[in-house]
């Protein structure tokens, strides 16, 4: 009986020791945002991005040859100084960065098509370590062809995050995947601290101006859902978004008549496209002239850093939440940031 007791005790401590060893090699999940998190488990790197889950060998990191099928992800690479790891990109006409355009001209970055049709043959020739893209259901067949040919695709839908800082936090994920973890953490911390500081100042203002946002496409006005990062920018900037009670996490199409009624007391109209003048705005849709805010308020477009079809607010602005918030606060509460000038936005005259 005594030897059985000794064997039991010995076995218990062996199992306990093994469990402790296993736990030491398994890290808890690192939460990047509401939709993205990753974990390192033994020799595996695990990633969750909304409904998608990935597992690959840690020795595959850092990635050194990347294809981007969405320009909105470009800003993260630029912020980390990792643009030379990009070997292919789609929609080159929408690229704002001079650095990227120069790399395209030198053929160091290849044009791999557009959001209408990707150049599968070109992508396969490039043999990238990974493709980063937003998930678009209509391209499911294209994704399958690439995956069947051994190409790794990671779907990242940063535009579906609810808060600007969650969207900016993808910088930390790219830092991990590109071997720039420390730099990414430092940059993100600075962005977050600056954002929170500006937000705190704006929240203290007793004045909360009513604000209309976005514009019409076809016969509908696509408002920012009340739970989108766009709506949260306005809230954090100390504004009263007229559709704040909406509970959607994406853009919502509504009629012009609904906007007309709801925007009666709006003092500002922001995110009014890429137009530079009110005349350009009316040329797109003359019905805007009926809005009170068009006649009496101030209108701001996301047009200050625009070149051709490219706009930097969708590039660097995807990461620099602090600069975007500064623009909104400068518009709604100029007294808070008297020395600042607008970075991405500009008033339509």
Describe the residue ranges of each PLM region.
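Extracytoplasmic ligand-binding site segments that recognize negatively charged/polar headgroups
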Residues: 91-98, 138-141, 157-172, 207-232
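Structured C-terminal subdomain patch of bacterial secreted/periplasmic proteins
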Residues: 65, 165-179, 183-186, 271-349
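A short, structured surface patch at a secondary-structure boundary
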Residues: 45, 49, 59, 64-124, ...
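Bacterial Sec-dependent N-terminal signal peptides
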Residues: 1-24, 328
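Bacterial Sec-exported substrate-binding components of ABC uptake systems
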Residues: 18-74, 182-212, 278-279, 295, ...
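Second-shell loop/turn segments in exported
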Residues: 62-64, 76, 109-114, 130-133, ...
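Flexible, glycine-rich surface segments
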Residues: 201-285
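Soluble non-cytosolic domains of exported or imported proteins
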Residues: 67, 113-118, 136-140, 161-168, ...
